[in-house]
Swiss-Prot record:
Regulatory subunit of the cAMP-dependent protein kinases involved in cAMP signaling in cells. Type II regulatory chains mediate membrane association by binding to anchoring proteins, including the MAP2 kinase. Residues 18-29 have a biased composition (Acidic residues). This is cAMP-dependent protein kinase type II-alpha regulatory subunit. It comes from Sus scrofa (Pig). The keyword Cytoplasm applies.
Length: 155
């Protein structure tokens, strides 16, 4: 398993709250099922969202111009994580976002680093690099749109 190094060719990336760890499909070892294997149980406490205490943390708001807000909203409109948000929820997400300009060859996230932001690409080309066995290879590219670092939103 490995994280991705994201190295822009050029561009602008927008942060909102993350880290990017993606599993390399070649690393997955799927055991062959045996009829003699024991069944594994999973237990968890019941969760009732109505019983959850209200969030008392202060809301994070980064000031931005109307133009910046429109650009952020446009960059986020096709991101699956945000598709089912109502206008108020999306507004809160946009409030928490801030812009970050990225220079050519700057690493946005490095493999094995703790990520602390979720990134939304407004423009630019970003290479996704993975290092395995001391060899770095390109496994993908973002071109003028996309997002990465979803795991940071969970923590």
């Amino acid at each position: 398993s490995g994280s991705q190094d994201l190295e822009p060719s050029s561009g602008l990336v927008t942060d909102a709250i993350a880290d990017s760890e993606s599993e390399d499909d070649e690393d997955l070892d799927v055991p062959i099922p045996s009829r003699f294997d024991r069944r594994v149980s999973v237990c968890a406490e019941t969760y009732n969202p109505d019983e959850e205490e209200e969030d008392t943390d202060p809301r994070v708001i980064h000031p931005k111009t109307d133009q910046q807000r429109c650009r952020l909203q446009e960059a986020c409109k096709d991101i699956l994580l945000f598709k089912n948000l109502d206008q108020e929820q999306l507004s809160q997400v946009l409030d928490a976002m801030f812009e970050r300009t990225v220079k050519v060859d700057e690493h946005v996230i490095d493999q094995r680093d703790d990520g602390d932001n979720f990134y939304v690409i407004e423009r630019g080309t970003y290479d996704i690099l993975v290092t395995k066995d001391n060899q770095t290879r390109s496994v993908g590219q973002y071109d003028n749109h996309g997002s990465f670092g979803e795991l940071a939103l969970m923590y």
